[in-house]
Curated annotation (Swiss-Prot):
The gene is Prl3b1. The keyword Signal applies. It holds the Pfam family Hormone_1. One of its GO terms (molecular function) is hormone activity. Belongs to the somatotropin/prolactin family. It comes from Mus musculus. The keyword Hydrolase does not apply. Residues 1-31 form the signal peptide. Disulfide bonds join 82-197, 214-222. SUPFAM superfamilies: 4-helical cytokines (SSF47266). It is found in: Secreted. This is Prolactin-3B1. InterPro entries: 4_helix_cytokine-like_core, Somatotropin/Prolactin, Somatotropin_CS. Keywords: Disulfide bond, Hormone, Secreted, Signal. PANTHER family: PROLACTIN-3B1, SOMATOTROPIN,PROLACTIN.
Length: 222
C-alpha cells in the first residue's frame, strides 16, 4: 500500500528524510571549491570539517591508548606540555564570548598552522609502529587532510571578512627527534602527547567556530 503525501510520516521516516536532506545540502556545499563558496556556506563546511577533525583526533587518541598506552606511560608519569601551549587562547566560555571575531579566527588559524608539521611526522611515526591497526593509520592520515582543508577554509573566510589583516604564523615545534627515537617508550610517549594535544586543540577550534558561525552568520540568533 502506498502512502499518500497527506499521511503523517513515521518517526523513522522523518529521520530518514532529514538525513537525506542534510546529505543533499552537504553534497551541494562540498561540490564547489572553497574559494567559490559564499561565506555562509563556507562556514557550514568548516564547521562540519572541524567537528570531523575533532572526532578523528578523539578516536585515534583512544585507539592509541588501548594499543600503545602502556609503553607510552613507562617513559614518565608527568604529562608533557603541548607545543601549542605558548599560543594565547580564550580558555572558557566567558573569555571566548569576550574575544572579537577577528581574534577568534586568528587564533584558530594559528593553532591549525602549528599542527601542519607535527601531523606530517605523526603519519610517518604511526606507520612505523609495530602491528599498527589499519584504523589508527587511516585516521592519522585523514586527520592531516582534514586539518589542511580546515585551515584553507578559515584563511579564505579571514581574508574575505578582514581584508588586509594578517593572521599570526606559528610553526615552532621541537619534539620531532623524539618521534624518531630508537627507544620505544620515548617514541610512544611523544606520540601520546601529540594525540592528547591535537584532541585538545581541535576541540578548542571546534568551539571557537561554533561561536563565530553564531555571530557572523546568524547574528547571534542561535
Amino acid at each position: 500500500m502506498k502512502l499518500s503525501l497527506s499521511q503523517p510520516c513515521s518517526f523513522s521516516g522523518a529521520l530518514l528524510l532529514l538525513a537525506v536532506s542534510n546529505l543533499l545540502v552537504w553534497e551541494k556545499v562540498t561540490s564547489l571549491p572553497n574559494y567559490r563558496l559564499p561565506t555562509e556556506s563556507l562556514y557550514q563546511r568548516v564547521i562540519v570539517v572541524s567537528h570531523n577533525a575533532h572526532d578523528l583526533a578523539s578516536k585515534a587518541f583512544m585507539e592509541f591508548e588501548m594499543k600503545f598506552g602502556r609503553t607510552a606511560w613507562t617513559y614518565g608519569l608527568m604529562l608533557s606540555p603541548c607545543h601549542t601551549a605558548a599560543i594565547l587562547t580564550p580558555e572558557n566560555s566567558e573569555q571566548v564570548h569576550q574575544t572579537t571575531s577577528e581574534d577568534l579566527l586568528k587564533v584558530s588559524i594559528t593553532i591549525l598552522q602549528a599542527w601542519e608539521e607535527p601531523l606530517k611526522h605523526m603519519v610517518a611515526a604511526v606507520a612505523a609502529l609495530p602491528h599498527v591497526p589499519d584504523t589508527l593509520l587511516s585516521r592519522t592520515k585523514e586527520l592531516e587532510e582534514r586539518i589542511q582543508g580546515l585551515l584553507e577554509g578559515l584563511k579564505i573566510i579571514f581574508n574575505r571578512v578582514y581584508p588586509g589583516a594578517v593572521a599570526s604564523d606559528y610553526t615552532f615545534w621541537s619534539a620531532w627527534s623524539d618521534l624518531q627515537s630508537s627507544d620505544e617508550s620515548t617514541k610512544n610517549s611523544a606520540l601520546r602527547t601529540l594525540w592528547r594535544c591535537v584532541r585538545r586543540d581541535t576541540h578548542k577550534v571546534d568551539n571557537y567556530l561554533k561561536v563565530l558561525k553564531c555571530r557572523d552568520v546568524h547574528n547571534n540568533n542561535c
